[in-house]
Amino acid sequence: MADYILTIVEQVGLMFAELARLKSGEKPAGISVLCLRETGLPLDVVKHSSPETILQLLKTGGGTQYARAVLLAELLMQDADLSDAAGKKREAIIGRAQAAALLEHSIDQLSPEEQAIYRPKLEALTSDLERISR
C-alpha cells in the first residue's frame, strides 16, 4: 500500500514539474496532454461532463479509479487557475466544482497520508465555491 501512495504523490509531483517547465501559453495544451496520459480521458470530454459521468468513465480503470480521480482533480484545479488568469471565471468555477466532486467521492478511499494532503484541498475548494455562490 505504501508503494501505491508514493506512486500517486510522485505522479502528482511529476505532473506539476512538467507543467512548471511549460511556458504560460503552452500550459493549457500541457494539461490536456497530461489529462489524457494520466487518466485516459480527454480534458475536453471531462470539462463538458457532469461529475457523475466522469466518475462512471473512471470506473473503467478498476482499481485505479480513485487514484485517477485524484490526478484528474489536480489537473482540473490547475486548469481552473489558468481559466481565472485568462478571465474565464465561469470555466474556473466549473473546473473547481468538478475537482471538489471528484475529491469528495474519493477521499474516504485514500490512505490516511493521502487524506492529510487532500482533505485541506477539498475544504479549500468547498469554501471557495460556497463563497462564490453567496
State the predicted function of each range.
Residues 1-69, 104-105, 128-134:
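N-terminal alpha-helical interaction modules that lie
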Residues 5-10, 66-74, 93, 97, ...:
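Start-of-helix signal in alpha-solenoid helical-repeat scaffolds, especially tetratricopeptide repeats
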Residues 18-22, 75, 82-85, 89, ...:
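Residue-level signature for tetratricopeptide repeat
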Residues 24, 77, 84, 103-104, ...:
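Specific register positions within alpha-helical solenoid repeats of the TPR/Sel1-like families, i.e.
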Residues 24-28, 88, 95:
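Residues in the short coil linking paired helices within alpha-helical repeat scaffolds
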Residues 104, 109-134:
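Glycine-rich, aromatic-bearing surface loops/beta-hairpins
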